[in-house]
């Protein structure tokens, strides 16, 4: 059974959580992305759901990227780390709330989530997808507001932005390939039970 784990902030807590459940994994060496035994793959967070949907048996990713990707995967567990939120933020000196953002240009790494949010409140906006620091888009005047991940809010404050609405809460999720869920039912079920045991201990 293979695991695809996200590079970046979720990697360390993912490994620690799996180890608490007795799942010992050999990690890739140095800059390598696949472990020597082929059981562990490291991928960009946004790509983890795609790998799981298309064949890697198990993965861990944030609920933000799973929703944004719209990947068809089985999600047996919400995990107790990676907690943050996706929010709407605007310049502090031009504070506006989402209901008043008709015709605004919104910069985001999450166009699907942002579009769905503004559609749900009946506000017509232009959503612009960016891959880098979306805060820069407002500072340079190419966007009126952003929709982005917020943990402490420090990055927003450093860029003169204020959070005006929460779009969704985010946490890490356990992802399982739908075919593997059936073909490797016993193995997958054993893994889920081990992880659930760790969750119950921490409750």
Curated annotation (Swiss-Prot):
Transmembrane regions listed in the UniProt entry: none
GO BP annotations listed: L-histidine biosynthetic process
Highest taxon in the source lineage: Archaea
MF terms (GO), sorted A to Z: ATP binding; ATP phosphoribosyltransferase activity
Catalytic activity: 1-(5-phospho-beta-D-ribosyl)-ATP + diphosphate = 5-phospho-alpha-D-ribose 1-diphosphate + ATP
Gene3D superfamilies: Periplasmic binding protein-like II
This protein's GO CC annotations: cytoplasm
Function: Catalyzes the condensation of ATP and 5-phosphoribose 1-diphosphate to form N'-(5'-phosphoribosyl)-ATP (PR-ATP). Has a crucial role in the pathway because the rate of histidine biosynthesis seems to be controlled primarily by regulation of HisG enzymatic activity.
HAMAP family: HisG_Short (MF_01018)
The family this protein is said to belong to: Belongs to the ATP phosphoribosyltransferase family. Short subfamily.
Protein name listed in UniProt: ATP phosphoribosyltransferase
Primary gene name: hisG
